[in-house]
Amino acid sequence: MAAILLDIDGVFHVSGEPIAGGADAVRRLREAGHRLRFVTNNTTRARATLAEELRAMGIPLDDDELQTTPRAAAHTLAGRRVLAMTMHAIVGELEGVELVGEDAEAVLIGGADETPETNIVFSYMNLARAFHELEAGAQLYSLHKNRWWQTKHGPLLDAGAFVAGLEYAADTEAIVLGKPSRQYFEAALQALDAEAGMTWMVGDDIDADIAGAQGHGMKTILVRTGKFRPDEVEASRIRPDGIISSIAQLPEWLEDHL
């Protein structure tokens, strides 16, 4: 039996539209005795909301099986004064963090979504305010640094572009709290009481999921859904341990290879 980390966006759904076979795959994995943890860089909705959306797709999971980056941020930044450029829906997840508009000790950048709120969160004035705080000595944190994400309308620009802009302007480097950071993967392993070498990461992102997990000694499986692009995989130096058509194929693949 294995410990398995499962990405969500692009693996189980795209823009809320389920990818066929996901719910059945999770049931089969549980029946086979595998230990599962759902790990996501989604930074636009609260954990309870994300978990409920997955259950509505027929995917059986408890809230505490879902690991999110806003909660990682709350743990890291507890007790600190933070200027947070995030979607309103996750503000409640930042428990213990003192959210401020000035004199911040840290600047926290969240993710984008497909709603008009993104235009407000990442407005020029908000980015300029974040830059001002960084110049005054605040430390830059990012929930993730994804360049783009896949939607039903095609790829959309993600928050990594704004993080890179602030890094360039303030001549600093962001501390990434989600995938592919070491602390995020270590938290997942600890939750499963698993060793890296006996753990599989399943995802659609060759960088955040596959390269990140391999960098921490895990085995990896790339799905041909979501962000998967054959040309990017071909050009990459990263080679997953397996490539499958979709999450639906995972139980059978593991039966053949474990």
For every predicted segment, state its role.
Residues A2-H34, T43-L258:
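Asp-based, Mg2+/Mn2+-dependent phosphohydrolase catalytic module
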